[in-house]
Structures are given as C-alpha cells and as structure tokens.
C-alpha cells in the first residue's frame, strides 16, 4: 500500500485501526504497519493530545510504541520480571514481541532486549500471551501462545527456557526443538485457543495448566492439560470450568488463604491434605473477549475430579470484576520475597488510534496491586503495593473534619495534583435522605451511573472527588459514591446499597474522546456512615479504590486544560445530606526511574 501519505488512504487506515482498537485488537494477524512516519499527516489531532504532560509519570510505560497484556510476571534471584506484549515498530497493535523489563522494587524499571520474538515455525506469525512457572529446582519456564498459520489464525502453545539460569536478569531465552508442545486437537477451536496459565503440581507428580478457549458459539472454556516434563501434555477428559460468557482469554487460576491472613499462596505448591485444603479457596479469573473486562469467581478446586466449582452458583452470571473500568488481560503472580500475590493489568488508551500514532505511544500497566481474600470469603480485596508509597512527597496536605454541605465543593490546595496520591475518609451524618434503588438497575451499576452521574443531584451523594479539574471546572473527572435504599423486596429493610462510580464525561473539551462512565456496587455496610476512597492520579489515568479495595475503577482521561500545574483537586457533595471529610491526605508523587530513564 504505497499511498499512506495521501489523506484519503490515511483516513481509511485510521478508521480501520480505530475499529480494531475499540474491539480490543489484541489478537489479530496482519502485515507490518509502520505508521510513525505517517503520523505527521494525521488531521484533526488536538495539540493537547501530544502534550508530554499527558504521558504518565509513575505508571509502567515504555518510552514509545504500543503495549498490551502483561505476561509471565515473576520474582527471580532478587529481581522482579515483567514481560509484556509490545510492538517495537509503532503505537498500534502489530509486530508483537515479548518485551522484558526488570526491577528491584516494582516501581523503578530497567528495560532489557525482547525475550521472545517470532523465530520458529510454531510462532512465526505471533508470540502471544502466556505465563511463567517455577520448577522444583527454582528454574522458571515460560509457556506462551504461538501463531503458526496466518490464514486461519491457528494457535498452539510453546515453551521457552532460560539459556542461563544463573543469570538473575534472565536475558536470554531459548525455544526447544520440540515446540509446539500443545496443539488444538479433539475438536478444539484452533482460532480461539490461547494464553496458558501458570502451572501447578499435584500429588501425583503431574503439572497442570489451563488454556482459554471458546466452545461452540458462546461458551468460555478453561481446558486442563497435564504433564510430567513440560514437554508431553495430555488434555483432561473435561474442562476445569466453563460458562456461557464468550471466549475466555488470559485465564488465571490460583489459591488464596481463607483463614483471614493476607499472605499469598504459591500456585505451584501442592495442597494435598484435608486440613490444609480447608484453609484455601481458589480464584478463577477470565478476560472476556467480547466485553473487554476481567471477571472472577471464588470457589473450590476438586483435585480428584479436576473440576472447579464457584461458591456462588450465579457467579458466572453476576460478574465480580477486578476493576470496573479500563483494565484487561490481567495476570497475577506469587511474590516469595514478601509472601504476597500481586496483580498486573493492562489499561489501553481511550482516545483514537490516530491520536496514539501522533503521540507515539499507547497503553500502560496499572499500578501493581496486592490481592487477598476478603474475610467474608465472597470477593478479593485489592490495594496498591506498598512500594508505591515511596514515591510520595515528603510533606502531605491534610484536611480534617471538614463538613461539605449540599451543593458545595472544596478545593484542596497546597500541592500539584496532576500526579498525586489521595486518601480520604468520609462520614455521612444520616442515611435518611437516600433514594430508593430502582429494581430495574439493582444488578446494573453501569447503567445506574450513566443515568445518574456526578452532576445529578441525589439524596446521599453523589459525593467524592473531582480530580484533574480545571480552574473554571470546564474539565473534571469525578470519582464518587452514591447511597441508595435497597429495592423493595417483600417488605424487607436490607442494608443500604453503595454505588461507586467514575464519571469522566467532562474530563476533556476534546470532543473525540471515548468517555464512558464506569461503576460497580460496593459490598460494604455503610450503616455507620463511614466509607473510604483512595485515588492514584497520574496525568492521564485515575486509579481509584473504594472501601479499602472492595471496588476498583481505572479510567483514562485526556484533559486539555487541567494539565500539569493547571490541574486542581476538589471534594464535592451533590447530595441533600451533608457529608464530613474526617480526614483527607494528599501527596504529590515523584517520578521513578522508568524504562532506563524515559
């Protein structure tokens, strides 16, 4: 296609790429797209989009180009490793390799050369996502999806081994000649067969892992494969689990302690005795290809039957999500250094593909989160890893016992808030003004938030934060709570329903932005009137954690006015009931050493 320089051809290509990006565009095979030179011909890209102040300051992001799924995170010989899907040639999806970065603290990162690139027949047309497993001798092994037929998008599973296990940086990886080690036999859909998980070892000495797939037109499936040597694999007679949700990408399956401790559990460690099994629950997470979000269930793993059963029979229908915002293709790993489980997730851009090409970069990784089982046993709790607090400035701004009346907003001054960490505890004096929850929206937080956003006056709430706000409030991103009385059911009272929402509909004056509201119900008891919120603000991303990590929302925003020193922070209350900020603490966030100083 030799006419990329023409306006017509460029417009057509931008439309194609935008459609791919909005659909996720994570698993498509096409020829090389080298669009960097063509970026200068793009019309209609606002100057604010290419402003360097919109590039994140402390989130994981390479200096340029496209990234997506986090792959094979691990801790090895004193170093944290993160591999990730990366296009070395441009800011759109394509030419994917496994980029590789290492860190001592999960905050400051050094980029190494790509670890896995197309080089053998079994991955000639793509090296897609996968996971790492620590063998009994402590050596890591990577399993990943390869594409070896471009015409039908045929997917197989391959293995890669470190060339030198004594190298703590694992700078070189080799692919044995016996790849691929798993192929889609027995009626499996070869075009929907990918993303092998971390393996775990059973009492019988066999390793087991999952591969995500699609059965029929709509059934997501996690197939179980067994092996003694990571070379010869056999599929189990039945899947670990399946549900009518659409294709399951990037499955993740891991144990969590069920006895109230926040410690992680190594996936590869066998739990064989009944007493130990009683102290452990299992989490099965899947990334929904059609809906572009991650959901999980908590349940029981029957090792003899090779089956997983969610505790909630409706768990595959009423999805609990890691994050109700822009967060996908997640992967956890066990950190033996601090005995915790850490969650990584990809956040794509929400501007256009033309914008991404113009600015030269697309995609970030969310701040790593520690995850553990809530004492209720019903869901996970998530919290930014403690290391991120090292980036906080020395002197925080503190606001205490500040009453915010109905319709009032209060500016938080004394710091630059475009790159900040804000923790706030709210108190609601009375819940009597809470509105009745519409039964039609009792299971649809997103619809409820869209219908009644941050500016819609309510009873108890909306109250929360306006972040990345301009001086005249022409631009603002709202992160807030709203409290409802439960929908009437048989005359029972029930506990109040808490909605958490991020509303970016006024985040930018740029009319071309994708600015959806994001929302989730928070499973918390607010009858005492107390609830907390933490927001990590980083120029073009807002990551928020409600009620101690019971609900999380990540949103990408691109202000044109509220940039750098012009960004402001407010507490607001658009409800009828007054609220009190019992304490707000806000820190400016420093920039880490990211990707060799970028």
Curated annotation (Swiss-Prot):
Belongs to the glycosyl hydrolase 32 family. It is found in: Secreted, Cell wall. Keywords: Carbohydrate metabolism, Cell wall, Glycoprotein, Glycosidase, Hydrolase, Secreted, Signal. GO terms for cellular component: extracellular region. It catalyses: Hydrolysis of terminal non-reducing beta-D-fructofuranoside residues in beta-D-fructofuranosides. Glycans are attached at residues 164, 189, 348. Disruption phenotype: Slow grain-filling resulting in reduced weight of grains containing loosely packed starch granules and reduced levels of amylose and amylopectin. The active site is at 69. Expressed in leaves and flowers. Weakly expressed in seeds. Expressed in growing roots, node and the rapidly elongating zone of the internode. Its EC number is 3.2.1.26. This is Beta-fructofuranosidase, insoluble isoenzyme 2. Induction: By sucrose in caryopsis from 1 to 2 and from 9 to 10 days after flowering. GO terms for molecular function: beta-fructofuranosidase activity. InterPro entries: ConA-like_dom_sf, Fructan_Metab_Enzymes, Glyco_hydro_32, Glyco_hydro_32_AS, Glyco_hydro_32_C, Glyco_hydro_32_N, Glyco_hydro_beta-prop_sf. It is an enzyme of class 3 (hydrolase). Residues 1-25 form the signal peptide. CIN2/GIF1 is a potential domestication-selected gene that controls grain filling and yield, and could be used for further crop improvement. It holds the Pfam family Glyco_hydro_32C. Cell wall-associated invertase that cleaves sucrose into glucose and fructose and is required for assimilated carbon partitioning during early grain-filling. May be involved in sucrose unloaded in the ovular and stylar vascular tissues for the stimulation of starch synthesis in the developing endosperm during grain-filling. Sugar homeostasis mediated by CIN2/GIF1 plays an important role in constitutive and induced physical and chemical defense against pathogens. GO terms for biological process: carbohydrate metabolic process; carbohydrate storage; defense response to bacterium; defense response to fungus.
């Amino acid at each position: 296609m030799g006419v990329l320089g023409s306006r017509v051809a460029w417009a057509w290509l931008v439309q194609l790429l935008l459609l791919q990006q909005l659909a996720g565009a994570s698993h498509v095979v096409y020829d090389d797209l080298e669009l960097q030179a063509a970026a200068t011909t793009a019309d209609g890209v606002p100057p604010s989009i290419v402003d360097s102040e919109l590039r994140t300051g402390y989130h994981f992001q390479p200096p340029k180009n496209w990234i997506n799924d986090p792959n094979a995170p691990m801790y090895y010989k004193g170093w944290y490793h993160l591999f990730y899907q990366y296009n070395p040639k441009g800011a759109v999806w394509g030419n994917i390799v496994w980029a590789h970065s290492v860190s001592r603290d999960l905050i400051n990162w050094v980029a190494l050369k790509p670890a896995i690139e197309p080089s053998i027949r079994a991955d000639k047309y793509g090296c897609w996502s996968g996971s790492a497993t620590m063998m009994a001798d402590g050596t890591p092994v990577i399993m990943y999806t390869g594409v070896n037929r471009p015409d039908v998008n045929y997917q197989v599973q391959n293995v890669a081994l470190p060339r030198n296990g004594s190298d703590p940086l694992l700078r070189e990886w080799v692919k044995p000649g016996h790849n691929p080690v798993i192929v889609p036999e027995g009626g499996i859909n070869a075009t929907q067969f990918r993303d092998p998980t971390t393996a775990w070892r059973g009492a019988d000495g066999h390793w087991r892992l999952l591969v995500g797939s699609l059965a029929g037109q709509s059934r997501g499936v996690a197939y179980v494969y067994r092996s003694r040597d990571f070379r010869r694999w056999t599929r189990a007679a039945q899947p670990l689990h399946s549900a009518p949700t659409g294709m399951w990408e990037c499955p993740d399956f891991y144990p969590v302690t069920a006895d109230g401790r926040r410690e992680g559990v190594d996936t590869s460690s066998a739990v064989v005795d009944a007493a130990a099994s009683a102290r452990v629950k299992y989490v099965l997470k899947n990334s929904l290809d059609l809906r572009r979000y991650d959901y999980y269930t908590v349940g029981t793993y029957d090792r003899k039957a090779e089956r997983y059963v969610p505790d909630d029979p409706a768990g595959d229908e009423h999805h609990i999500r890691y994050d109700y915002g822009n967060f996908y293709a997640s992967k956890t790993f066990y950190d033996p250094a601090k005995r915790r489980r850490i969650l990584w997730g990809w956040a794509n851009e929400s501007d256009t593909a033309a914008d991404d090409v113009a600015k030269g970069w697309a995609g970030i990784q969310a701040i790593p989160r520690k995850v553990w089982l809530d004492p209720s046993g019903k869901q996970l709790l998530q919290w930014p890893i403690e290391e991120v607090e090292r980036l906080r400035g020395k002197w925080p701004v503190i606001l205490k016992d500040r009453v915010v009346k109905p319709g009032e907003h209060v500016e938080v001054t004394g710091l630059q808030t475009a790159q900040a960490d804000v923790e706030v505890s709210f108190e609601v004096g009375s819940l009597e003004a809470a509105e009745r929850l519409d039964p039609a929206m009792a299971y649809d937080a997103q619809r409820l938030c869209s219908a009644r956003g941050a500016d819609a006056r309510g009873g108890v709430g909306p109250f929360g934060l306006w972040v990345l706000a301009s001086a005249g409030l022409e631009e603002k991103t709202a992160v807030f709570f709203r409290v409802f009385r439960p929908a009437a059911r048989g005359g029972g009272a029930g506990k109040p329903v808490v909605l958490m929402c991020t509303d970016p509909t006024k985040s930018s004056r740029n009319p071309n932005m994708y600015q959806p509201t994001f929302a989730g119900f928070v499973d918390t008891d607010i009858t005492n009137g107390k609830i907390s919120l933490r927001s990590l603000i980083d120029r073009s991303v807002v990551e928020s954690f409600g009620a101690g990590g019971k609900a999380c929302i990540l949103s990408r925003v691109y202000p044109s006015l509220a940039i750098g020193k012009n960004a402001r922070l407010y507490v607001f209350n658009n409800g009828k009931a007054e609220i009190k900020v019992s304490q707000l603490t806000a820190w400016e966030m420093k920039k880490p050493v990211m990707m060799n100083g970028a």
